Amino acid sequence: MRTLCSLLLIGCLLFSYDTPVVGFLRRSVSGFQECHSKGGYCYRYYCPRPHRRLGSCYPYAANCCRRRR
């Protein structure tokens, strides 16, 4: 019984926190969502001529571009 409880406790502790990969994925998704919520799109290279750069999209450091009005 003690062994079972110990294994259960170890399993809960291992899976209860976010790993660094999960934090990285959350930042990357939030970067894309933030760009799209501003009306932009993620473009890997420089923004085309009539567009301007709003920021960057994670994880590839792509540019968040939006057309000038």
UniProtKB/Swiss-Prot annotation:
SUPFAM superfamilies: Defensin-like. Pfam families: Defensin_beta. GO terms for molecular function: CCR6 chemokine receptor binding. Keywords: Antibiotic, Antimicrobial, Defensin, Disulfide bond, Secreted, Signal. This is Beta-defensin 11. Residues 1-23 form the signal peptide. One of its GO terms (biological process) is defense response to Gram-negative bacterium. It is found in: Secreted. Its main location: secreted. InterPro entries: Defensin_beta-like (IPR001855). Disulfide bonds join 35-64, 42-57, 47-65. The keyword Disulfide bond applies. Has antibacterial activity. Belongs to the beta-defensin family. It comes from the Eukaryota. GO terms for cellular component: extracellular space.
